[in-house]
Amino acid sequence: MFGVTENTLWVESFRPGTLDGYIGNEHVIQKVKIFIENGDIPHLLFYGTAGTGKTTLAKIIANSVDADLMYINASDENSVDAVRDKIKRYASTVGFKRWKIVILDEADYLTPNAQAALRNLMETYSRTTRFILTCNYVEKIIDPIQSRCQTFGITPPDKSVVAQRLVDVLNEKQVEYDVNDIVAIINSSYPDIRRAINSAQSHVVK
């Protein structure tokens, strides 16, 4: 592949900002659209393979409603104190929008005690705060949290759909490529869309 290298990560530059730009999982998207149209977002739990768009979908939802947003990556902040203190401080303050949304990314990294604290926070602040959790392994999320969420499995799009998204990115970045390049990247990365785009960017040379 030949193009111009840059510091900006393509996965961020081309992260969909709306539901219309999101690929795959049409049945989930239709339900999410109803939540947004009604202006009433439940607690949500998205689970599935890494790189298939769980975090992207969570951020689209948060940005599509009248809400303040707090984002926490639970792989970095997974202790009971981090969850309880940070979220409680955020949820208990007066907001200027209808909702407060907490995205807990990689929630399966939360310790059992942290999950127990989270369950209590979900109950205490349910009038004003909605929680959107993402994880790879839903079985690591305690049942009391799962029961408080609308839970959706996020499945990877077909290889052809991922390949077309990669082609769109390369065309937008004016990168010359061979079809064999696309096939090789998809075969080594699928079903991880994020990995495919990162791999393509890493192969671009000056």
Give the positions of each predicted feature.
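P-loop/Walker A NTP-binding region and its immediately flanking N-terminal helices
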Residues: 1-152, 160-171, 179-187, 195-202
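Loop-to-helix "switch" segment enriched in basic
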Residues: 205-206
